[in-house]
Amino acid sequence: MKKAIYPGSFDPVTLGHLDIIRRSASLVDHLIVGVLNNSTKTPLFSVEERVNMLREVTKDLSNVEVLSFSGLLVDFAAEHNVSVIIRGLRAVTDFEYELAMSQTNRVAAPGIDTIFLTTSLKYAYLSSSIVKEMAMYGGDIHKFVPEEIIDRVYEKYGIKQ
């Protein structure tokens, strides 16, 4: 059984993330979406909220499991017997960072490979940061995040839709 992890903060999950999740799920037998609980950052959504949102928007994907983790990704991968990490790339600038991370992971855990999926063109500009900034000012985020979570994003900024 080929297992992979698609890690991220997903704060909030975007349609770009969901695109990578769906495409990744079609490539492997079992995909773990790993939601990073980074204690050095102050996220908009708690790790529990992010996990729940991801579970909701991936419920139709029977081979996708959503779990949270903290610490090193390679340790999380080892705990779950995963040898493939999937990363999405939007632009060349993403590649430089992701290449360095994949090489670091390969040194730390030689049995782990990284697969890069380029984001679909219609989502190449999209990031969670853009979504948060748009929502903070009451901008329309319907084209950026799954329908199921739109109200929750606005609620974080005290905006009623």
From Swiss-Prot:
Q: What is this protein called?
A: Phosphopantetheine adenylyltransferase
Q: Name the job this protein performs.
A: Reversibly transfers an adenylyl group from ATP to 4'-phosphopantetheine, yielding dephospho-CoA (dPCoA) and pyrophosphate.
Give the UniProt keywords, A-Z: ATP-binding, Coenzyme A biosynthesis, Cytoplasm, Magnesium, Nucleotide-binding, Nucleotidyltransferase, Transferase
Q: Does the keyword Isomerase apply?
A: no
InterPro entries for this protein: Cyt_trans-like, PPAT, Rossmann-like_a/b/a_fold
**Annotated binding of ATP, by residue:** 9-10, 17, 88-90, 98, 123-129
SUPFAM superfamilies named among the record's database cross-references: Nucleotidylyl transferase
> What organism, scientifically named, is this protein from?
Lachnospira eligens (strain ATCC 27750 / DSM 3376 / VPI C15-48 / C15-B4) (Eubacterium eligens)
